[in-house]
Amino acid sequence: MRVVSMVPSWTETLLKAGVQVVGRTRFCIHPPKMITNIPIVGGTKEVSWDLVIDLKPDLVLLDQEENPLEMAEECPVPYLATHVSSLQSLQTELARLGEHFKNPQLMELSVDCLDILEAPVPQWDFQKIPAFMEWVKAPSQGYKQVAYMIWKKPWMSVSRETYIGSVLEKLGAKLVEYPEGEKYPVVELEEMKDTFFLFSSEPFPFHKKIGELKELGIEGAIVNGESYSWFGVRGIEFLRETLLKK
């Protein structure tokens, strides 16, 4: 089956499972050696349908959190839209993809995800932060909550209603509580007292702005955003290594 994947984490997952991916977004950068010769048809928010049609795909793969509704509505070929908003929904969607593609490796990943869901939740350790890259300022006290930051100007965080939030909670972190329905709330850092900040390396490249962050005087760390936000094979490998020590 010829697949155009508009979801970076699914692109990597499908390729590693042996599915034939014939088109991708410019953000589909993994696995590096496998994506080199796969044509780019757009980004996660916009696409050239002419380029897609030229590739003669059997299916376009979308995700409700990654791609806009218009992309599904305008898609000129059959499509499948997943909806990954938590570890639980990831397990469900992996099983669905495994069945759709009749692919045992995808089914095996869904079982791995189930193992992760059933694993005990550890105590969050601020001295051993998973996917740690660099200190903005090391914690000088105990913190009861963390805020995972994804954007600057405006400052944006994530709630527990997201896949990232689900991952953090599984790792034992207590997230800042936001109003229900606000998945990616705009926040004011100076108003967030007694909060330790995790600055993601993507989509905003906080690791390249470490000097500016240090000037704020807040305590926090830079973490690898791919580990926390790329669901599928990359996220599962990260959680297996962290939670199951496999």
What are these regions (language model features)?
Residues 1-246:
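N-terminal ligand-binding lobe of clamshell/alpha-beta domains
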